[in-house]
Amino acid sequence: MAKFIMVVGTSSNSGKTVLVAGICRILANKGYKVAPFKSQNMSLNSRVANEDGEIAVAQYTQSLASKVEPSIHFNPILLKPMGNFVSQVIVQGAPYKTINYNEYREDKEYYLTKIKESLEYLNKNYDFVVMEGAGSCCEINLLGDDIANLRIAELSNADAILVSDIDRGGVFASLYGTVELLPQKWKKLIKGFVINKFRGNAEVLIDGYKKIEELTNIPVLGTIPYSEELELPEEDSQALQNKKVFGNINSPVEVNVVRFSKISNFTDIDAFSKDALIKFIDFKEDITGDILILPGTRCSTVEMDLMKKYKMDKKIKDFAKKGGIVIGICGGYQTMGKMLIDDTHSEGDIGTIEGIGLFDMETYFGNKKAIVNSNGILSIKDDDFLVNGYELHEGITHSNEKPLIKLNKGFGNKNDGYDGSINIKDGNYLIGTYFHGIFDNYEFRNHIINMVLAEKGHKLITEDNYKDNFEKNINKFAEIIENNVNLEKIFKK
């Protein structure tokens, strides 16, 4: 039987995701088998779990923090926004329906049934389950339909922690207001408060601690100091709205990423963050980098239409002709071909549209979605690399180019044992693949970066700086939590 803990917040972006990851690492380091859990997540960033089903990237990252293999039961309900208030619903890893909010509400009892199934599975197979809420746990206009917060804590008899971000201001009012607005049956589940992102001397908060404890009869478990040095993955495309440039600002290598309107799985790019400067460019902007990445997208035909409208397709062709490295991932790969053929309009209203034309290939839409963890041998110049990735795509690609990867497992271009396309002759350096997570394979990533470094006369890299950086940061954050938050009572079974 597992002990259930839930982290809920006074608002979105209060620190729930990273706090769950940190608690998971603390417990894993103590030798416990730990599962992260989020009953319902809304995100365009997803990964493939062990069962070849989709879960949100946040729960995948939390599974890394937990030192366990990712499972579809860590995120039984995943909502992938498609625009116009419509989302694709993924249930225990598999596509279920594409519906609007009112239709979703009508299916609430079905989703609760699947959530309970996953909770039962976790209860039988783990020592601890550390659950994450969604947004604010007390949106009083939505409480009746909320299946992501304290209703789940009640179902699992979890001890709940309420976290609030003091960097936004009004932390004590947020804590007090949230607790007082909760129904009594859920209020009593809150066992402690955590104040996140505090700058300065925490002693100035002592009077506030005392007052909030007197008012609510709930203790403050601790305060997590703000740290600019911590580097943990972003969860969703919302994080891109205010992000233009990130990564290693001192690197001589610049990676440009086209900011697609329906960008998905942009966490593919994170792997470059230690060794390159990463810059997102809009359709109207010029390409200034050494490497151009066309990322994943929910709708390749829409992005292709927009690229034509703003002449981005021409800019990409010109960049490639000058020897620039162009890499397309999933939907971005599809746009690199001659044609995107959507006679059934499964991608939307646009239908069939010409691609950029970098590859001699065509992609046909309307097939069942491929959801699979994949691996194979990637061949580039004189190097062969064993690479792992995951596929989340509709579309079958017929390519006359040399394939990039000989598959051991996966769907690839058209379920024929090969994935991707590569053209590195006649001054071209064009790469496309359906593998999300391709850059997590450090030998391939370093190969791409080292091409630029060598051309500019810089020292080449040989280490896996990205993976090492994640482990270093999650362990550091776990240590910060242990040093500043009293969780022993929460951990007691």
UniProtKB/Swiss-Prot annotation:
One Pfam family from the record: GATase_3
Q: Which InterPro entries match?
A: Class_I_gatase-like, CobQ/CobB/MinD/ParA_Nub-bd_dom, CobQ_GATase1, CobQ_N, CobQ_synth, GATase_3, P-loop_NTPase
Domain of life here? Archaea
Keywords from UniProt, A to Z, are: Cobalamin biosynthesis, Glutamine amidotransferase
Q: Which residues form the active site?
A: C330, H436
This molecule's function is given as: Catalyzes amidations at positions B, D, E, and G on adenosylcobyrinic A,C-diamide. NH(2) groups are provided by glutamine, and one molecule of ATP is hydrogenolyzed for each amidation.
Any idea what this protein is called?
Probable cobyric acid synthase
Source organism per UniProt: Methanococcus aeolicus (strain ATCC BAA-1280 / DSM 17508 / OCM 812 / Nankai-3)
